[in-house]
Amino acid sequence: MSHLQNLLLDTLLGTKHVDSAALIKLQERSLCVASPGFSVMPSDVRTLVNGFAKNPLKTRREGLYFKEKDYKCVRADDYSLYAKNENTGVIVVKTHLYLLVATYSEGMYPSVCVEATEKLGDYLRRKGN
């Protein structure tokens, strides 16, 4: 298991409020690591990368289509996308090299998922990643 995968498992899934997580390489637009059982399809990678490439206001208006679900975007800026669909959601944080993706499901606290994902994103940015 790689250092990056350990980070995902320990800092995100370890909270019990992150259902699944992944790191996407921005330059290659490809999956780097993911939590067990979480697959991110190339179309989903494009959706997330384009969510940052577009004007954040446009992303916020249009929402995201991720993992075969429409999500309402509740935050979109240069570094973060938060989107929800009923009792589930996806949090995406942009670093220099990666998109950090975390999902939460029913019964989990979105605020804990957001906080853990943003903290890991800050850590990766400080490390130059």
UniProtKB/Swiss-Prot annotation:
<dbReference type="Pfam" id="PF00235">
    <property type="entry name" value="Profilin"/>
</dbReference>
<keyword id="KW-0446">Lipid-binding</keyword>
<dbReference type="GO" id="GO:1905198">
    <property type="term" value="P:manchette assembly"/>
</dbReference>
<keyword id="KW-0744">Spermatogenesis</keyword>
<dbReference type="InterPro" id="IPR036140">
    <property type="entry name" value="PFN_sf"/>
</dbReference>
<protein>
    <recommendedName>
        <fullName>Profilin-4</fullName>
    </recommendedName>
</protein>
<comment type="function">
    <text>Involved in male fertility. Required for manchette development and acrosome biogenesis during spermiogenesis. Binds in vitro to phospholipids, including phosphatidylinositol 3-phosphate (PtdIns(3)P), phosphatidylinositol 4,5-bisphosphate (PtdIns(4,5)P2), phosphatidylinositol 4-phosphate (PtdIns(4)P) and phosphatidic acid (PA). Contrary to other profilin family members, does not bind to actin in vitro.</text>
</comment>
<dbReference type="GO" id="GO:0008289">
    <property type="term" value="F:lipid binding"/>
</dbReference>
<keyword id="KW-0963">Cytoplasm</keyword>
<dbReference type="GO" id="GO:0030317">
    <property type="term" value="P:flagellated sperm motility"/>
</dbReference>
<keyword id="KW-0221">Differentiation</keyword>
<comment type="similarity">
    <text>Belongs to the profilin family.</text>
</comment>
<dbReference type="GO" id="GO:0120316">
    <property type="term" value="P:sperm flagellum assembly"/>
</dbReference>
<dbReference type="GO" id="GO:0005938">
    <property type="term" value="C:cell cortex"/>
</dbReference>
<dbReference type="GO" id="GO:0007283">
    <property type="term" value="P:spermatogenesis"/>
</dbReference>
<dbReference type="GO" id="GO:0001675">
    <property type="term" value="P:acrosome assembly"/>
</dbReference>
<dbReference type="GO" id="GO:0003785">
    <property type="term" value="F:actin monomer binding"/>
</dbReference>
<dbReference type="InterPro" id="IPR005455">
    <property type="entry name" value="PFN_euk"/>
</dbReference>
<dbReference type="InterPro" id="IPR048278">
    <property type="entry name" value="PFN"/>
</dbReference>
<keyword id="KW-0217">Developmental protein</keyword>
